[in-house]
């Protein structure tokens, strides 16, 4: 969602910081419209980070996020590759966290499929506007993904960027984030197996 963009932009400007507007979107594995929903296939989705380079990118991102709610809502608001192809101008894309499609394929041992998907995104955005996203949160799966991302980089020349999968601003916000995740997933903070 992009509900806080205007407030974010104003606060950054007041603080002398150049705002970079973006959104982590959900990408449907098949089509996004209500006519293309089969629970067995369409209840999954993956993350993709989109950042605006300019005003055209902001317009394209705003349009896609709106379409995700209007046409693509199935469990979550989703876009698809068709929408990305039509509205990629002015945007930079990052391969996302462990919930991204490329990391998912690497975790599942599908290196060739991960590489093919990375090349598809590079074709959509252009080789200078799609980045493989390296993260390190001390998670075993992340080391496997990073190794695969580095291999894709070495074989294709796709650029790398180091990021962090941040969900709150300060350590003090961790409890509120935990509570919100529990509400979203129907768990309690006492549940050892809850999402964190």
Predicted regions: what they are:
Residues 1-196:
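Phosphodiester-processing cores and adjacent nucleic acid-binding clamps
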